[in-house]
Amino acid sequence: MTIKRKKVSVIGAGFTGATTAFLLAQKELADVVLVDIPQLENPTKGKALDMLEASPVQGFDANIIGTSDYADTADSDVVVITAGIARKPGMSRDDLVATNSKIMKSITRDIAKHSPNAIIVVLTNPVDAMTYSVFKEAGFPKERVIGQSGVLDTARFRTFIAQELNFSVKDITGFVLGGHGDDMVPLVRYSYAGGIPLETLIPKERLEAIVERTRKGGGEIVGLLGNGSAYYAPAASLVEMTEAILKDQRRVLPAIAYLEGEYGYSDLYLGVPVILGGNGIEKIIELELLADEKEALDRSVESVRNVMKVLV
């Protein structure tokens, strides 16, 4: 008898992709197919086998395979894209656009061919533009092509707030809107610690410093690593989104969604609060923004559109 589980394919077997695959398997969310280019097929198979051999120790039942053949990804429920060239110290997100856009288009054609009903979650940077590129190439409904940045950016924001207050991170809630870059918009007014507004707990200048650190969060880790970029928190964020989809949890999460008039913008992907469930993005939630918040979001949108101009 064949065991029928959900199926998730992770494209890109680097640090983020491999970590995502392992976390998905550990949580028994799905069988996992880890995919990379033919030149890296053996290392990809090796990573997958290594993860599988951890299953008796970690106590999880999930099959994991490594491959370079997209036929192995057929009929995936969710496809997570982490592939692309890595961001290096001093490299702007704009520098990544041309190369990663070509990579996205090639990957997307294979996904659409083998898993036409899948939901695609994109991580590859610059993620707002890359998600748009995938959407245009796939021809999927907008609800089924989603970018990941807000969960990660919000996680960083929550981490820094918890450290500042010496509170549990479990009790910190918040939202980060906009593009995944230096112009992202952490919404302090919609952020709480145990239901208490942050503005009543943390002095304004400290909050501003935390907001600024959140904006530079990815760059901070890139600088510390010296080579490569963050992968544990990005992988955990991808898994949270994938779990919400596979289990139809209808989670309220920040995600990169295609806008058609929401917040006053159209024809771009931008980080906004959404309801994430079995159909992908079930609904975009429009928050009322103050004038300064809307101005900040406008700047973020301008940055995203400037990156999109480089799309090939």
From Swiss-Prot:
UniProt entry tagged with the keyword NAD: yes
GO-annotated biological processes? lactate metabolic process; tricarboxylic acid cycle
Query: What keywords are assigned to this protein?
Result: NAD, Oxidoreductase, Phosphoprotein, Tricarboxylic acid cycle
Role according to the record: Catalyzes the reversible oxidation of malate to oxaloacetate.
Where, in this chain's numbering, is NAD(+) bound? 12-17, 36, 100, 123-125
Its taxonomic path starts at:
Bacteria, Bacillati, Bacillota, Bacilli, Bacillales
| Top EC class, one word | oxidoreductase
Q: CDD domains this protein is in?
A: LDH-like_MDH
In Swiss-Prot or TrEMBL terms, this protein is called Malate dehydrogenase
Tell me what reaction this enzyme catalyses: (S)-malate + NAD(+) = oxaloacetate + NADH + H(+)
List residues binding substrate.
87, 93, 125, 156
Q: Which family does it belong to?
A: Belongs to the LDH/MDH superfamily. MDH type 3 family.
Q: Which Gene3D superfamilies match?
A: Lactate dehydrogenase/glycoside hydrolase, family 4, C-terminal, NAD(P)-binding Rossmann-like Domain
Q: Give all Phosphoserine modified positions.
A: 149
- Which residues of this protein are catalytic? 180
Q: Does the keyword Protease apply?
A: no
Q: Which InterPro entries match?
A: L-lactate/malate_DH, Lactate/malate_DH_C, Lactate/malate_DH_N, Lactate_DH/Glyco_Ohase_4_C, Malate_DH_type3, NAD(P)-bd_dom_sf
Record-listed E.C. numbers? 1.1.1.37
- Its domain of life reads Bacteria
One GO molecular-function entry = L-lactate dehydrogenase activity
Name of the gene: mdh
